[in-house]
């Protein structure tokens, strides 16, 4: 028995009454997808196919984490677009395409990977996280995270080796903010409203001191 069939059987045994089983994978479009990234979707794909083989309705969901921070310029990209160093800190979806053929850095490498999957005959339900964030789909969850930030800190602190200070606990926020002035996440939240709807923050790049509301598109 293939390992994916065993996992599929275990899933069905655990949740036998599901109308549809959803297998999920996801990565950031940080550059050309290598074999390590491909393993993530391949694992979910084999389980998805095993579920279908056993007569179950299943779907393969793939999340493009394109609202993640652009952390570094890959060596092969730096050779043709060294100026992208200036865009580190922005979400991938807001970084320009170094090859000039797509609307963004994210779209370029997403299309490259999606074309490869298509050649292999892999059918995927793609989701783009920038659309979910900017549509406000996650707003209520972000508010909850801000409201319960100290509880979240306490949970994480249980797994730390060093003792946390009360100052660290007080300053902790489980969210990041992309500055609407410079577009980067070089921000520090300094306070929030009691209901978690508004955060006050500063940006080290644009030297701004602003407030972010839960409906804003740059809260993540």
How should these model regions be labeled?
Residues 189-192:
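Short Cys/His-rich "knuckle" micro-motifs
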